[in-house]
Amino acid sequence: MDLIFSLETWVLLAASLVLLYLYGTSTHGLFKKMGIPGPTPLPFIGTILEYRKGIWDFDIECRKKYGKMWGLFDGRQPLMVITDPDMIKTVLVKECYSVFTNRRSFGPVGFMKKAVSISEDEDWKRVRTLLSPTFTSGKLKEMLPIIAQYGDVLVKNLRQEAEKGKPVDLKEIFGAYSMDVITGTSFGVNIDSLRNPQDPFVKNVRRLLKFSFFDPLLLSITLFPFLTPIFEALHISMFPKDVMDFLKTSVEKIKDDRLKDKQKRRVDFLQLMINSQNSKEIDSHKALDDIEVVAQSIIILFAGYETTSSTLSFIMHLLATHPDVQQKLQEEIDTLLPNKELATYDTLVKMEYLDMVVNETLRLYPIAGRLERVCKKDVDINGTFIPKGTIVMMPTYALHRDPQHWTEPDEFRPERFSKKNKDNINPYIYHPFGAGPRNCLGMRFALMNIKLALVRLMQNFSFKLCKETQVPLKLGKQGLLQPEKPIVLKVVSRDGIIRGA
């Protein structure tokens, strides 16, 4: 009897292991059947281990090895990688509303599923439509003075660091500027975060912004997607609960205070959303509810912080390694804004070389190194069958450095984006902010923010290499596109007279 029971136990165990193995590999034959090449997936984990060498270099390696299209697996989830610009246009633009509306879900996010970057289908369309007027050029012009005051704080803080006579860690300085601008424009909160690191807002926001593709919760959901509804039922979220509660309470309090005080308020994103709630032109059932206002404020913070701080850091490294470009940029700024005049929205638009420098930096270092869309139904795109549930991924970083599309792609050449040349650039090869109806809603705000800071910096400082500067710059292996080591440069005052200090 014991022997029989023992045998049954072993058979049951063996059957369980076989079923478990089949579950862990059931999707892994998809691309092989379709004749699409790619690295060999491992049970359960797929091709995730390949990311250990760095996601961005891995994408470039795959482009060289497999050609225009290849297949990957994040756990059991198939990713079809496409690089053909016509196919990318179909996914991002032509079939956006019908098939490729949504981004990938990264698991339980609580009320943040209402945020414009995360929401899906009709919910996304409604929120996007309501938010779009917030990012018009007219609204950005009104918001520019808010950002300008933080540009003065940036100059003051950088001057104080430079006067210590030591090389400056740029991410710390630009991270503080970025946080000040985003908290000021999305929450209406004034903070000099570099000088007030213990401020509750600063501490909570910094916790929110810590992110890694190798986070245990994210990995568990990638390997076992069926855990998502269980985590949601247990109120476990990708975002720290205490941080989200703090931000939710803060926004609600700020909103209540503003509604009680009838005085004219400055134009910021929070106020514009409050105004839209009370607009007679919007049906009450379509307007943003209070929790949606909170979600949008937080997602603006989450998306805007890294874009600004990292891009400014990359720009300064490139300018320090290309002093001729830095000098030419300073000359353009000095000509259009003599005597350190403050930039206006219209002046920023006129600065052609400034635009070229920023665009070329975003080519080399696009903050979103990949774009993804989920296929909602079986579809044939340009002769390629894409099954329902497949994630279609466009490797932006690899496309931006593809020698088939760029001469000497690893070289920093702002002239690529001159008036004469930029019309030759395919918008479905170069897309640092995405493309189509679901591109980055805050693109113009981000560019204005970056350019305004860059003008203030170039008016007052020159940036030079020092022994601590990593040359050539290497990228880290975490999820976001960031340098391997902090970017450290020598900062020199141009004339000792620093406006705003």
UniProtKB/Swiss-Prot annotation:
- Sites binding heme sit at 440
* PROSITE patterns linked to this entry: CYTOCHROME_P450 (PS00086)
- What does the UniProt keyword field contain? Endoplasmic reticulum, Heme, Iron, Membrane, Metal-binding, Microsome, Monooxygenase, Oxidoreductase
Give the EC class as a word.
oxidoreductase
Q: Does the keyword Methyltransferase apply?
A: no
What induces or represses expression of this protein, per its UniProt record? Answer: By rifampicin.
Q: Outline what the protein does.
A: Exhibits progesterone 6 beta-hydroxylase activity.
What name appears for this protein in its UniProt entry?
Answer: Cytochrome P450 3A6
Q: Which gene encodes it?
A: CYP3A6
